[in-house]
């Protein structure tokens, strides 16, 4: 939620099962997030002219070099992440507290 919010995306309740595509550093003023079902598959194809050194970065950890015609398939993993909750407050209580100064 924090990364998505800082990129201009929506606030999403943690148990909601959805995929959100949020443009980062978009070149147009009408770029908006798209909210999809977590069951949807997203396919991205590299089209047109690609300059040397184009790549895709995954979670800031690994990357691949891309060429015209390459495709990336994004889908929900079968492996779920278990999150640790450190306080007793609800998501909305925490959100209200964090956004109070805005």
Language-model region placement:
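Catalytic phosphate-donor-binding core of small-molecule kinases
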Residues: 3-4, 8-102
């Amino acid at each position: 939620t924090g990364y998505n919010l800082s990129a201009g995306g929506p606030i999403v309740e943690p148990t909601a099962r959805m995929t959100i595509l949020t443009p980062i550093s978009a070149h147009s003023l009408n770029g908006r997030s798209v909210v999809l079902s977590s069951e949807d598959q997203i396919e991205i194809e590299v089209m047109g002219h690609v300059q040397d050194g184009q790549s895709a970065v995954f979670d800031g950890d690994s990357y691949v070099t891309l060429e015209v015609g390459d495709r990336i398939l994004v889908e929900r993993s079968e492996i779920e992440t278990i999150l640790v909750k450190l306080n007793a407050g609800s998501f909305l209580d925490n959100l209200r507290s964090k956004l109070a100064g805005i």
